[in-house]
Amino acid sequence: EETGVKNIIFHPKFLPSIVILDPVLTVGLPPKMTAATGMDALAHNLEAYCAPGFHPMADGIALEGMRLINKWLLEAVNNGSNIEARMNMITAASMGSTAFQKGLGAIHSLSHPVNAVNNIHHGLSNAIFMPYVLTFNKDVIEDKIIKICDYLELKDRSFDGFINWVLDLRKKLNMPHKLSEVIEEKDFQLDRLSKMALEDPSTGGNPKKLTEADMKIMYQHSMSGTLF
């Protein structure tokens, strides 16, 4: 809160000996928070899969994580007492955090600064930034996105079909389309946020090499609601 910076702290000794995923503990999570954390899990799996580099295990985990989210997120939001839906969502979330050892990308780079400076929920900001970052990266991720469409068995198995799936999912979850719906223009520090986004640890995992100008234009598109 004092610095306005979201830091990542990690050490091998932080790793637990065992992890128990108990869906019963998530039953009381309100629908809005279930939606936001579910979109966060989607962002983890999606960016891990699109990150450059060779990591077939992470790719496989990420694909299956996205399939589970596609099947179970809306049910978990609309019927929070459905233990099967909760179990599959907590599993998908765990899979995403396993897969992103491969890398993340600009969705997270843009999110972390607004989380720290503007106090916007991380999953909510990831959901907002997702289609803008995807369309910005289109020329280098289109083949991977089509593979995701095939695995999820989407009706329209194209890049635009995937974008429409993301937009439709957000709409069904009652999530905002534009960053300006959650941050007022007067509170939006474009230069500061863009610099922070470029310096974010997630930036190195983006499929395209990014500049501060790239961060600015992605923020601007996210504020206006204009896809690339």
Language model features with spans:
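Alpha-helical scaffold segments in soluble metabolic enzymes
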Residues: A41-A48, G60, E64-E75, N88-T91, ...
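Carboxylate- and glycine-rich phosphate/diphosphate-binding segment that chelates Mg2+/Mn2+
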Residues: E1-K102, A213
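C-terminal charged capping/lid subdomain of soluble metabolic enzymes
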Residues: I145, C149, E153-F228
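Short helix-capping/linker segments at secondary-structure and domain boundaries
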Residues: Y49-H55, G103-L104, F136-D143, T226-F228
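A ubiquitous short alpha-helical element
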Residues: L29-P31, G53-A58, P131-V133, D160-F162, ...
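C-terminal catalytic subdomain
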Residues: L104-G161
